[in-house]
Regions:
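Multi-pass membrane proteins that catalyze or facilitate reactions on polyprenyl-/lipid-phosphate substrates
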Residues: 1-166
Length: 167
């Protein structure tokens, strides 16, 4: 399973590096860009609910399934894109049930988020007055980790009983 998980993260890691300058330019029109991505996520989730077979679990995941879900994770590098929405939808379109698709989507986010955070941390370390910001950065990091964990836990529980239509 670790190999499949690793393979699923490769597309987003490559896209993050190659598209960095293009994506930074998109933040000049954030409302338009975010609107386009939110509508795309809504369409993907609707298609996943309508066409997804939802009969498979993570134990049946192949490298090809992981690649498909990983390719959808590329959308997350663009402003306003829902990483979880696009990857959960891709998992469901590959035939996975909602909870399995969501679990995989969140597991595959860990390596990508760690890589992106490490990359951004290199810029933070170069700050002249870093010492004065460290307490705020630490509070922000801990708060984000706790809220993220609680949100994922809630969403996994929600998706065992409900569809993606409400999103």
């Amino acid at each position: 399973f670790r190999r499949v998980l690793f393979r699923s993260t490769i597309p987003a890691l490559i896209a993050g590096v190659l598209l960095k300058h293009i994506v930074e330019g998109l933040f000049k029109k954030p409302f338009l860009e975010a609107g386009i991505r939110l509508l795309t996520a809504a369409a993907l989730m609707t298609l996943a609910e309508y066409f997804g077979k939802r009969t498979r679990s993570l134990s049946g995941m192949t490298w090809f399934d992981a690649l498909i879900v990983g390719l959808m994770q590329i959308l997350a590098v663009f402003p306003g894109a829902s990483r979880s929405g696009s990857t959960i939808s891709a998992g469901m379109l590959c035939g996975f049930d909602r909870p399995s698709a969501a679990r995989f989507a969140f597991l595959m986010s860990i390596p990508v988020m760690l890589a992106a955070s490490t990359y951004e941390l290199l810029d933070v370390i170069k700050m002249h007055n870093l010492g004065s910001f460290l307490p705020l950065l630490a509070i922000g990091f801990v708060t984000a980790a706790i809220v993220g964990w609680l949100s994922i836990k809630w969403l996994l529980n929600y998706l065992t009983r409900n569809s993606l239509y409400s999103f």
